[in-house]
Structures are given as structure tokens and as C-alpha cells.
């Protein structure tokens, strides 16, 4: 379902940062200021968000992987929830340097996590001493927190969706280095450079974060559904062709 201007207003997408912290590169997306707070021009944000959703829809229809990134306190739960709903990987605890540029190392950690989870399933914990079990549980909890959201990501993602480019500068830099497209929410205090699909908007409000994440997840699910429908239609068409020529 398409996001409306009213929904953006209600979520506070238009509230930027204090004027003294602004980044001049965001000037084209700023409407003005009120009480020393920059106001983002939603007439720019809405079509740009629609463009980002269109791109995500196409990517998902082609079975692409979009990595959700949002590690700030107010976005963690939403990022995990919406990524899981869309069947996509996510990082919501801390971006570990090299998560994309040094994927080989990440794969080693993912294997370790999966092996440990398999050991738990097999009841291996019961065979351990109390101390061994405690250390094991601590390690698995740490791994689940840091890489649990990417354990099923088979390789470098086809795109990343980031909430707050300043806070996740390393993630954006790694994506740029590898030529991975970046879809990102950029507030008035950051630069839109290095972002392929800029969504000018508030990156602190939990309501605004929910609006972006839900919109991206919805676009992924729509893209996948469209792809399935096309396959069904093609199969139906083939069946009709066979019947006609039978």
C-alpha cells in the first residue's frame, strides 16, 4: 500500500535536526525552519521514497537480497521485525567492520553460530559441565546478537537499506567500495553522498523509522508476489496453448 503525505506528517518525517547542525548538501530537500529546527520538504521526500520502493520491488521480483541496517536504540526492534517479515537479513546490534568487504571472515562466524545452534538442538548442552554450558551459552548469545540477522545471508547483498547514514558510515562505505546500491534515510545533519536512493527524512523518530521500514518490507513482499503471479500466468498461458494444440 502506498505511503501518503499525511502518514509522513503524522510520523514526523518532516522534522529535521537543529539548524546549526545542518549539512549544506541537504539544502535541496529542506523546506525551511521553525524554532531553529529544519523542516524537510515532504513534496521531495514522498516521490523519492516511492522511487526507492519501486527499485526495491524490482530487486525483490528478481530474487535480490536487501540487507536492513538500523542499530540505533529506537530502530533496532523495527528493523529486525520488518526484515524478518520480508524474509531479508538484517543488522540491528552493531555493524562489525568488514561485514561485507571481508565476507569470508563473517562466513566463519556464521558457521560457528550454526554449529552451536545445531549442538543445542542435539542436546549437547546437557553433556557439558555447568561452567562449560555457561560459557557456551554466553558465546552463542553474543553471536546471535551480532550476526543472528545475517546467518542466512548466502553472500554479499544486492542492496542495503540504511536508517541514519551518519551512524552507519562504515556500512555505507563498505557498500560503496563493493558497488552495492544504498537505499538510505538521510536527515538534515548528514550528507546524501554515496547514497543511490536518498530518502530525506527524520532518522530519530521511532514512528518515522517504522514508516520507512514497513514501506520497504511491503515493497519487497509486493515484488515477490508480482514475480510469483507472472510465473503462474505464464504457466497458465502454456497450459492453454497445449490445450489449443491438443
Curated annotation (Swiss-Prot):
It comes from the Bacteria. Keywords: Ribonucleoprotein, Ribosomal protein. GO terms for molecular function: structural constituent of ribosome. The lineage of its organism: Bacteria, Pseudomonadati, Pseudomonadota, Betaproteobacteria, Burkholderiales. GO terms for biological process: translation. The keyword Phosphoprotein does not apply. PROSITE patterns: RIBOSOMAL_S2_1 (PS00962). Belongs to the universal ribosomal protein uS2 family. GO terms for cellular component: cytosolic small ribosomal subunit. This is Small ribosomal subunit protein uS2. It comes from Burkholderia thailandensis (strain ATCC 700388 / DSM 13276 / CCUG 48851 / CIP 106301 / E264).
Amino acid at each position: 500500500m502506498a505511503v501518503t503525505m499525511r502518514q509522513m506528517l503524522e510520523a514526523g518525517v518532516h522534522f529535521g535536526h537543529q539548524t546549526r547542525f545542518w549539512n549544506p548538501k541537504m539544502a535541496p530537500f529542506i523546506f525551511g525552519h521553525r524554532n531553529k529546527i529544519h523542516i524537510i520538504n515532504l513534496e521531495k521526500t514522498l516521490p523519492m521514497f516511492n522511487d526507492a520502493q519501486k527499485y526495491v520491488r524490482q530487486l525483490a521480483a528478481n530474487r535480490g537480497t536487501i540487507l536492513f541496517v538500523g542499530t540505533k536504540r529506537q530502530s533496532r526492534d523495527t528493523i529486525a521485525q520488518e526484515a524478518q517479515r520480508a524474509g531479508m537479513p538484517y543488522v540491528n546490534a552493531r555493524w562489525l567492520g568488514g561485514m561485507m568487504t571481508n565476507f569470508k571472515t563473517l562466513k566463519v562466524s556464521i558457521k560457528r553460530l550454526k554449529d552451536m545452534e545445531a549442538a543445542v538442538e542435539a542436546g549437547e548442552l546437557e553433556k557439558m559441565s555447568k561452567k562449560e554450558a555457561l560459557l557456551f551459552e554466553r558465546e552463542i548469545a553474543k553471536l546471535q546478537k551480532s550476526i543472528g540477522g545475517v546467518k542466512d545471508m548466502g553472500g554479499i547483498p544486492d542492496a542495503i537499506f540504511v536508517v541514519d547514514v551518519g551512524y552507519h558510515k562504515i556500512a555505507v562505505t563498505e557498500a560503496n567500495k563493493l558497488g552495492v546500491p544504498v537505499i538510505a534515510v538521510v536527515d538534515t545533519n548528514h550528507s546524501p553522498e554515496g547514497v543511490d536512493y536518498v530518502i530525506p527524512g527524520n532518522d530519530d523518530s521511532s514512528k518515522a523509522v517504522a514508516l520507512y521500514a514497513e514501506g520497504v518490507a511491503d515493497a519487497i513482499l509486493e515484488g515477490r508476489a508480482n514475480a510469483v503471479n507472472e510465473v503462474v500466468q505464464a504457466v497458465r498461458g502454456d497450459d492453454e496453448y497445449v490445450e489449443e494444440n491438443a
